[in-house]
Amino acid sequence: MQKICFLLLLVLTFASGQAQSPAEVKLRKKDYKRDVELVTDSGTMVIRLSDATPLHRDNFLKLVKSGYYDGVLFHRVISQFMIQTGDPDSKGAPAGKPLGNGSPGYTIPAEFRPALFHRKGVIAAAREGDQVNPSKASSGSQFYIVQGKKFTDGAMDTLERRRNIVIPADQREVYKTIGGSPHLDQQYTVFGQLIRGEEVLDRIASTPTSKAADRDRPLQDIRIVKARLVKRKR
């Protein structure tokens, strides 16, 4: 009887640990010196979070440590633009189901930084549109990785006139040589950068997607199998 009770206690303890919510996760000093590894069906990517966006950094670390992202799909994929994930409703979602409205039940205040822009490989927070979200607050969990495309000076000149913005010279050079999505700058919070796995980004971005009600969802599911913190490689 004592053995049975002890085993039951172990099972309950393990189950409670697995069910830990992001709000219950405690960050340690060493967590801030770790990178985030995303193991997907299409390969592994490694993200380095920005210390310039502490609200988004801490939230992302807590979600990763809690296992929140394990099993979620890349539910919105647009070639030469971005790949989006982080919707908890995508876990186990049947084929054809429209996705993109799931969240942990909270948003994060925008953290726009001039030095963080939408070059290829950046990690940025998804959000609802300006009509219902004029403060541009970020989704609590959904994020995207920019693939983008290369822009000419002429294309950026046109964008500047239409948006009444100025793209700094150093960022222009990046958009011309590396690529990205400059029209998103200072509209969506950038909070990290892909440091390994750019070929995985390109592979996912090139996958065939739906044109039905679940528009832009990959026809064959691509998921984050496991998200975890890993030691930084120098």
Task: Describe the residue ranges of each PLM region.
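Sec-dependent N-terminal signal peptides
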Residues: 4-13
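Cyclophilin-like peptidyl-prolyl cis-trans isomerases
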Residues: 17-234
